[in-house]
A protein has these predicted regions:
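Short, Lys/Arg-rich, polar N-terminal cytosolic tail immediately upstream
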Residues: 1-26
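A structural signal for multi-pass alpha-helical bundles of membrane permease subunits
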Residues: 28-318
Length: 318
């Protein structure tokens, strides 16, 4: 009878343990998927149906008359062709991109600066500041727009009173009613509401950077700017990319502040893509199909920005 060498027995035992471990890990993975399947299915149902249905509407001629009859004629992509030929849509896209670049750029810079200050503050001061910073984030967007609309009021606005009493202006400024300042006025209101999210995320990321790295760089004679550029900023890049993606997607869809402060005006100065889709869909003649097409184009642009951000992140990692 053949006998197995001790090495062969050891290898067989290890193979058996590895096989059982692999089977156990597979079983745990399958169990995790099975337990999350109801939630995933519900999310797909809630999210996928509106997306697919909007895509269906964007390829058909849909108005009030068609809704009443329940008959949506196929229009061979005419909604998209008319959309791309509409100069108002081009203007809305230009305003949206300008608004997004302004809002996201300012928000990221301010978030990093404020988070760095909080990181240097005492524990009690940092906690109090974070609590106060969270207040604007809890304000509903439409309420935030109404608050800033009152602040921008030409005759009774708080902003004009403060600037006039401090001697910075000689007469009231119509912030929301001037074509040169309307979009920027909305941007300020939007940043005030959304900045806290970015600040808290960046501050949490700063807490995870080992102090030993900064201490070693200080010993080597690195200045504060060199430490920030070589240590802090590279380690913050993954978080910054996440903020860029989230804030870009939300800024592209800005609507409530536009509705409350300018309603797309004066003229077309603050006419953004979400407002364009809203007016197409809910204002006579209620071109619902073309409104859905504009929403799809907007989603495509957001996706392109997200891809660019992710490519930037991978390039930084490489």
């Amino acid at each position: 009878m053949a006998l197995l060498a001790p090495e062969s027995l050891g290898n067989a035992n290890r193979a058996g343990r590895d096989g059982r471990r692999g089977t156990g890990e597979l079983s745990r993975g399958a169990l995790g998927v099975a337990m999350n399947l109801p939630t995933i299915s519900l999310l797909l149902l809630v999210l996928a149906y509106p997306v697919v249905y909007a895509g269906y509407l964007s390829l058909h001629r849909v108005g009030i008359a068609q809704l009443r009859r329940g008959d949506f004629p196929w229009n061979n992509g005419d909604n998209y062709a008319r959309l791309l030929e509409d100069p108002l849509f081009a203007l809305a896209l230009k305003n949206t991109i300008l608004f997004t670049l302004l809002v996201v750029g300012v928000e990221v810079v301010l978030a990093i600066a404020i988070a760095l200050l909080l990181n240097q503050a005492s524990l009690w001061t940092s906690r109090l500041a974070r609590l106060l910073i969270l207040i604007p984030y809890g304000v509903p967007p439409i309420t935030n727009g109404l608050i800033w609309s009152f602040m921008y009021s030409f005759q009774f606005g708080f902003l004009n009173r403060v600037l006039f009493s401090s001697g910075l202006i000689n007469e009231p400024v119509n912030w929301a009613g001037n074509p040169d300042t309307a979009l920027y006025a909305v941007a300020v209101a939007y940043i005030w509401r959304t900045l806290p999210f970015a600040v808290l995320i960046v501050h949490a990321a700063l807490q995870g950077i080992p102090r030993e790295l900064h201490e070693a760089a200080t010993v080597d004679g690195a200045s504060a700017w060199q430490r920030f550029r070589s240590i802090t900023l590279p380690l913050l890049m993954p978080v910054i990319i996440v903020i860029l993606i989230l804030r870009t997607s939300f800024a592209f869809a800005v609507f409530e502040e536009i509705l409350a402060i300018t309603q797309g005006g004066p003229g077309d100065a603050s006419y953004v893509a979400a407002w364009y889709s809203y007016k197409l869909t809910f204002s006579p003649p209620n071109n619902i199909g073309m409104g859905a097409a504009s929403a799809y184009v907007l989603a495509l642009l957001v996706g392109l920005f997200a891809i660019a951000y992710v490519r930037l992140l991978y390039r930084r990692i490489a």
